[in-house]
């Protein structure tokens, strides 16, 4: 089913309330057709992001390659009751309003529910899971052990992610919920240095309908890097938006696709995107069928007077005017 033509919305998800202490306010955000939480609250009426909420099983890095085990360390060892209880406490504490009707973002990035996708600094989750099975079945061969580890991990990873989402939807019924970063694409990456998503990842996304069926919004991340060429930056955005729209089109309820976009380069966070990069990445999101953009910012972008002044200047001269042009052109 094709997704109906929708209104294109841009949201402000930047902790600019931190600039108020310097007497700097960001009231102009709304003048640029950008949806902005009232009083510049970070968790507010239009959008609220919850970082690592509840008590998801995790291996929290300590010094010297050691880690602290939280709630069992891996999903198959975790206590879901404790997690869901803490999750609700977290929600009620950060954003008590049960009538919240904005976008609710669950930002959980410690592991991924597809076993294979836990590489890089997430590889510890694979190793930990494999060790558990090996201790239990010392005489199994490597292949059998890995298969069993993968099966157990994925079963409970799904349980944790699915139940968390269902609980969020149950307690904040009017909100539109989704997990930050999903669906993953793994394009413009060392092993897949092209705009198109990794083929295996696309197949895995198709198998993750249990997650996407429960989300009202899909929230791919399109942060770009300075090390890429301007064309490669566009390719990165294109592939990720396309994949999210593809997933949405395959679902009965066609969830909206809002791309998470950061105004600095991911590998050079003191440099704002050039005007051309802003225009082209925004256009790419529109062209490929996205429903909107969530402008994100880190607390370390706004933790000094000079940083706040720079961001304000950038909003007024570059980002704001482009946001107006894009929203007016589409709508």
From Swiss-Prot:
Q: Which reaction does it catalyse?
A: Random hydrolysis of (1->4)-linkages between N-acetyl-beta-D-glucosamine and D-glucuronate residues in hyaluronate
Which GO biological process categories is it annotated with? carbohydrate metabolic process; defense response; hyaluronan catabolic process
- Which cysteine residues pair off into disulfide bonds? 19-308, 185-197
Q: Which UniProt keywords apply?
A: Disulfide bond, Glycoprotein, Hydrolase, Secreted
Q: Which GO terms describe its molecular function?
A: hyalurononglucosaminidase activity
Q: What is its EC number?
A: 3.2.1.35
| Pfam families tied to this protein | Glyco_hydro_56
Q: Where in the cell is it found?
A: Secreted
Instruction: Name the principal localization, coarsely classed.
Output: secreted
Sugar attachment sites: 79
Q: Does the keyword Secreted apply?
A: yes
Give the UniProt tissue specificity note: Expressed by the venom gland.
The active site is formed by 109
Signal peptide, first to last residue = none
What domain of life does the native source organism fall in?
Eukaryota
Q: What would be one Gene Ontology cellular-component term for the protein? A: extracellular region
Q: Which InterPro entries match?
A: Aldolase_TIM, Glycoside_hydrolase_SF, Hyaluronidase, Venom_Hyaluronidase
PANTHER family xref list = HYALURONIDASE (PTHR11769:SF35)
Q: Summarize the protein's role.
A: Hydrolyzes high molecular weight hyaluronic acid to produce small oligosaccharides.
Family from the record = Belongs to the glycosyl hydrolase 56 family.
The identity of this protein, by name, is Hyaluronidase B
